[in-house]
């Protein structure tokens, strides 16, 4: 039988999980949700994009900060004609042929009426962004997936977008050679057949011979009003494959399309509900897992979510933080 836990009990339960390093240092504006991280090619400035405020973003000279506000990426919202086009989600940022690409999601909470859009800029400075609208990756109640939480990867000469949330979970679609639009139909990469199929926020990263499919599992939000049962809050899992397009398995060999997934990071110490993750190959630190989390000493509202990051050790063949 499931029961809701009081907020006061969460730090005690989280402290029972051991073995994870604390998040790296962060100063300045450290509130974020579904972060997207990149370092500008021209001068090494870091930019961090976030769900909310029509994609809010901050910048800093170091991953540790101090982070200062830049503003909204698309202050007029998205040109995509869907509810939620003024409340954009889950930015994913990449550098493509001299332009910074930020993919974003347009949707409303719990809806499949969703689409993935794109904005580009040469500099990432405030006011420099061009909204290209929809990439053609979209969903409705007639689909078996939800077209949110985009992530771009370039592999073997092809761009792919990974996306999806609940329903049939994580999908992938090949993109055109200039990745502004989908090139063909999508296919499934990961699926949890149990419960509410609570997987989303995928991020693919190549290291060595493997492609690692990170994703967030569990309940993301609203902890201040409805605390999940212990272990059902957000946490980060991974599967891997030698191909970017399928056959992902966890460390036990269970297929990611059949509920497989190896734990990467979960609640511990003052960290609660880590997720919305990405991986950045930092020139000084090496691979870094970045994410949002609730600091139990600050609060559990969505607006309290903090920027977290840890270096990744791949020496075992699996990511360890």
Swiss-Prot record:
Active site, renumbered: 34, 200
Disulphide-bridged cysteine pairs: none
Gene transcribed to yield this protein: abnA
Family the entry assigns: Belongs to the glycosyl hydrolase 43 family.
Pfam families: Glyco_hydro_43 (PF04616)
Name this polypeptide is given: Probable arabinan endo-1,5-alpha-L-arabinosidase A
Any one of the GO CC terms: extracellular region
Example of a GO biological process term: xylan catabolic process
PANTHER family for this protein: ARABINAN ENDO-1,5-ALPHA-L-ARABINOSIDASE, ARABINAN ENDO-1,5-ALPHA-L-ARABINOSIDASE A-RELATED
GO molecular function terms attached to this record: arabinan endo-1,5-alpha-L-arabinosidase activity
Pathway: Glycan metabolism; L-arabinan degradation
Record-listed E.C. numbers: 3.2.1.99
Purpose of the protein: Endo-1,5-alpha-L-arabinanase involved in degradation of pectin. Its preferred substrate is linear 1,5-alpha-L-arabinan.
Domain of life per record: Eukaryota
Principal subcellular localisation of the protein: secreted
Major enzyme class: hydrolase
Catalytic activity: Endohydrolysis of (1->5)-alpha-arabinofuranosidic linkages in (1->5)-arabinans
Keyword Glycoprotein in annotation: yes
Localization annotation: Secreted
Signal sequence, renumbered to the chain: 1-19
